[in-house]
């Protein structure tokens, strides 16, 4: 990691003492769950992420609080909007079941991510999961070929997920 950024001298210093000059640099801060997760004492021993039950997304530290999306750790899933959307639906179903005194169904998440690779073509990464012994397990990952049809599918997918999330 970086310990110092010297903007005027176009140089950074790393934690091991290396001084690196740059023309253009993209700095990404250390990733972690948001401040609200820290304040609610949901963050685990690593002080960065929230451990959750893989079936309900209930915090392992604070019963009755469910955590979804990028704040979670321990699941073999990408940190993507599609995954957070899937986790949200599964968690909502689990909450309804738990409030009704019923066992939540074991519903694996779903994930599809599209990436444009030219001005006309895209690829898709599709992940399939199952629940095994109370844990989310990836059973298949497929990468589509680069083509125009995938790009067209990505546009429909984007409209659908935006409508689902934003209404």
Model regions and ranges:
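A conserved short coil-to-beta-strand element within the FAD-binding core of flavoproteins
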Residues: 1-10
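Central beta-strand plus flanking loop segment that forms part of the substrate or channel wall
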Residues: 35-37, 111-116
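FAD-binding beta-loop-beta segment adjacent to the flavin cofactor pocket
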Residues: 48-66, 107, 117-138
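C-terminal auxiliary extensions adjacent to catalytic cores
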Residues: 124-167
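Glycine-centered tight beta-turn/hairpin loop motif at sheet-sheet or coil-to-beta transitions
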Residues: 15-17
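Internal hydrophobic alpha-helix adjacent to the cofactor/substrate pocket in enzyme cavities
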Residues: 84-109, 115, 162
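FAD-site-proximal beta/loop scaffold in flavoenzymes
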Residues: 19-89, 97
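Glycine-rich beta-alpha junction loops
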Residues: 2, 24-32, 117-121
């Amino acid at each position: 990691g970086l310990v110092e950024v010297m903007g005027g001298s176009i140089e950074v210093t790393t934690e091991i003492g290396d001084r690196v000059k740059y023309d253009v640099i993209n700095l990404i801060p250390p990733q972690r769950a948001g401040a609200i997760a820290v304040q609610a004492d949901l963050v685990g021993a690593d002080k960065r992420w929230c451990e959750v039950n893989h079936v309900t997304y209930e915090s392992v530290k604070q019963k009755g609080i469910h955590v979804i999306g990028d704040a979670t750790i321990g699941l073999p899933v990408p940190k993507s909007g599609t995954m957070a959307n899937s986790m949200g639906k599964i968690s909502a179903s689990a909450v309804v079941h738990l409030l009704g005194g019923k066992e939540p169904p074991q519903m694996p998440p779903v994930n599809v991510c599209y990436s444009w690779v030219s001005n006309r073509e895209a690829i898709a990464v599709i992940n399939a999961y199952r629940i095994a012994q109370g844990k989310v397990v990836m059973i298949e990952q497929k990468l589509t070929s680069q083509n125009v049809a995938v790009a067209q599918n990505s546009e429909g997918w984007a409209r659908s997920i935006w409508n689902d999330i934003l209404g």
